[in-house]
Amino acid sequence: LNLLEIIDNPLQDIPLAAVMYSPIGHFSSEELAVIRAEEPPSQCKHLYDAATSFAQKYSDPTDAKNKESCHELAGRLRTFFNQLETYRRKSRYLLLRELLVYVLEDSGYYEFISAMPGAATRKANLDMLLERAGAFEKTSYQGVFQFVRYINSLKKYSVDYASAQELAQNQ
């Protein structure tokens, strides 16, 4: 859900940090700290602004002031934000379920969770999310923002259609 939240609005610091730190972003906590230390909140209010500023600042490998590690990190940031921008662009014309399938395939996240402990439950959770996205598309609401609100309201009111763990065990 964090990825959906930043597809909708990348200026949300907590979801952005979570995705950057996740297997989708592959950034370490130390790298996130370097980015934030280089671009403190007094200069860049949001992590997104700090990270894009860092990526631009260290983009030139021929600049002697640019440390090799910073240049490499800047390149990874540019790749990450290009991928995010692709998802944001696709969110404008793909159906929600199609977008989710695309993101899961493109990011390799579905394959990643398949190799983790509890893979069946994790896959069942993603399959349930895809089912809910399909059902959501049949309502009068549309878009990533509305879907995130819908899922958050389900969590808030503890609505659970079925345990993903039970579904995984039945497969």
Named regions from a protein language model:
Residues 2-171:
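Conserved helicase C-terminal RecA-like lobe
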